[in-house]
């Protein structure tokens, strides 16, 4: 911009140096300022130096959209909403809820051969589903699908 006005920065630096030589200065022009102003100016410059020397934040490699050492990023394959896997809720991953009688029947049937399980199941229910074990039907399902 100084070139547009007909002079450049080099000429201004020469003028400052000539002025320093006439005044027998060291060339830093800091001796004309008071001590407080000097320290304040150094502090501002130090802060500016820190800001200018700071790396770019965030680093460019973090965002793949800007490209990187491997070239431009590939487009992601669009997935159908219906084919994406979703985590199952905890209630579906657990065993279904059942009454105490059914739990004990299931546990007992593990020790019986497969061809005898149907008969064993019926006999177990007849023997154990009594009013002594379940007074007034307490603990049994009241309607189909309750447990």
Swiss-Prot record:
Alphabetical UniProt keywords: Developmental protein, Differentiation, Glycoprotein, Spermatogenesis
A Pfam match: SOTI
Top-level taxon of the source organism: Eukaryota
InterPro entries found in the cross-reference section: Soti
Biased composition (Polar residues): 82-93
Keyword Glycoprotein tagged: yes
Carbohydrate attachment residues: 128
Similarity comment: Belongs to the male-specific scotti family.
Gene knockout outcome: Male sterile showing spermatid individualization defects. No gross defects seen in testis organization or spermatid elongation but the seminal vesicles are empty.
Function: Post-meiotically transcribed gene that has a role in late spermiogenesis; required for actin cone progression during spermatid individualization.
Entry keyword Acetylation: no
The protein's name: Male-specific protein scotti
Gene label: soti
Tissue: Expressed in primary spermatocytes and round spermatids. Low expression is seen in very short elongating cysts, but were detected at high levels in a few longer spermatid cysts.
């Amino acid at each position: 911009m100084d070139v547009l006005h007909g002079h450049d920065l080099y000429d201004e630096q020469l003028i400052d140096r000539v002025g320093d030589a006439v005044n027998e200065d060291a060339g830093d022009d800091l001796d004309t300022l008071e001590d407080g102003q000097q320290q304040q100016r150094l502090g501002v410059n130090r802060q500016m130096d820190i800001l200018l020397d700071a790396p770019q934040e965030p680093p460019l490699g973090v965002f793949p959209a800007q490209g990187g050492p491997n070239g431009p990023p590939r487009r992601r394959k669009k997935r159908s909403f219906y084919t994406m896997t979703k985590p199952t809720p905890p209630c579906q991953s657990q065993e279904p809820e059942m009454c105490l009688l059914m739990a004990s029947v299931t546990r007992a049937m593990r020790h019986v051969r497969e061809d005898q399980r149907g008969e064993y199941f019926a006999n177990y229910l007849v023997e154990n589903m009594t009013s002594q074990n379940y007074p007034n039907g307490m603990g049994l399902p009241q309607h189909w699908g309750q447990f």
